[in-house]
Regions:
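Alpha-helical transmembrane segments of integral membrane proteins
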Residues: 1-2, 12, 90, 94-127, ...
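Hydrophobic alpha-helical transmembrane segments of membrane transport/permease proteins
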Residues: 14-65, 154, 158-180
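Membrane-water interface at transmembrane helix exits
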Residues: 22, 26, 30, 34, ...
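Transmembrane helix irregularities
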Residues: 29, 138-141, 254
Length: 306
């Protein structure tokens, strides 16, 4: 119980610190936000009105506490450019990003865990070297390059095999589940290959250490083969570490798929955040960054408590 309370206290402190960092970082950016949002040829009266609307004419400490009090009420603000609430914007984008990273993570697990186990169990030095090269190449391939290659191979209208949509998301979203899933296949594979290579390296490292430990020797002395001992005993012992890595990987993928979302023209969280930053939509950006930070910290807290 004491550990749980300590972790919760650290979570609150970290969340407060991140809110200060997000708020301060957006205020020290060069250029006047109100002038940029109003437009180049806007009259000074419009800029002044926009500064009052955004609360930029108030002291910084007052602006921060206004923002914090609004967050405490569940009010994440309204985008100046679109007029939509930040909650609805993030919700719409999350309905694309989270299925993408879940599908990508499933592909990564299907690649990383079996290959990591196989790399540990391989007796031939040549086979182990092949697995080592696969892990390095898979992790070194840039997401942009890998995505472009998949589009050229499988993209509908431009690829050799003409199988999956190469860009965009259905206008009716998940109203057409088949089309929505089809649009996520190539992006998810792009993500899955890169993340899968990292999971393969980590699985190989963890199981490799356990394979030479006394636990495996004890299991083998009970009549298990080396393969049985590694897969039954080793994997069970490695599960807490693997769960921690998978959880943190899932959290980091929310913004990590930003390049993939831009490449495949998916209106997800990362793509939307880039657009909002480019448009200097201050209210939307600061709330989106805070929500992303809170999500990452929450996943880290859950992983620690498991």
């Amino acid at each position: 119980m004491r550990f749980v309370l300590k972790r919760l206290a650290l979570f609150v402190v970290a969340l407060f610190g991140l809110s200060v960092v997000v708020f301060a970082a957006l205020r020290i950016l060069p250029g006047d936000v109100a002038s940029v949002m109003a437009g180049v040829n806007s009259p000074p009266e419009r800029v002044t009105q926009l500064r009052e609307q955004l609360g930029l004419n108030r002291p910084l400490i007052a602006q921060y506490f206004d923002w914090m009090s609004a967050l405490a009420r569940g009010d994440f603000g309204t985008s100046i450019l679109t007029g939509r609430s930040v909650t609805s914007l993030v919700g719409a984008r999350a309905s694309i990003t989270f299925p993408l990273i879940i599908l990508g993570l499933l592909i990564a697990l299907a690649i990383g865990l079996p290959l990591g186990c196989a790399a540990v169990l391989a007796r031939s030095a040549t086979v182990r070297a092949v697995f080592h090269v696969l892990a390095i190449v898979g992790g070194a391939v840039p997401a942009l390059w890998g995505g472009l290659l998949l589009i050229l191979l499988f993209g509908r209208g431009v690829g050799l095999l003409d199988v999956f949509p190469s860009q965009g998301f259905p206008l009716d979203g998940w109203g057409a589940p088949g089309s929505a899933i089809s649009a996520l296949v190539l992006p998810a594979v792009s993500v899955g290959i890169i993340v899968g290579a990292s999971l393969m390296r980590y699985t190989r490292a963890v199981l490799g250490d356990l394979a030479s430990s006394g636990y495996i020797d004890m299991a083998r002395s009970c009549g298990m083969t080396r393969t049985q001992a590694v897969l039954r005993v080793g994997l069970r012992l490695a599960t807490p570490q693997l769960v921690s890595v998978i959880g943190l990987t899932f959290a980091s993928m929310v913004t990590g798929v930003m390049v993939i979302e831009n490449l495949f023209a998916l209106p997800g969280i990362g793509n939307g955040l880039v657009t909002d930053v480019g448009n200097r939509d201050l209210i939307a950006v600061q709330s989106e960054l805070f929500l992303l930070a809170a999500f990452f910290l929450t996943v880290g807290l859950v992983v620690d408590l498991l």
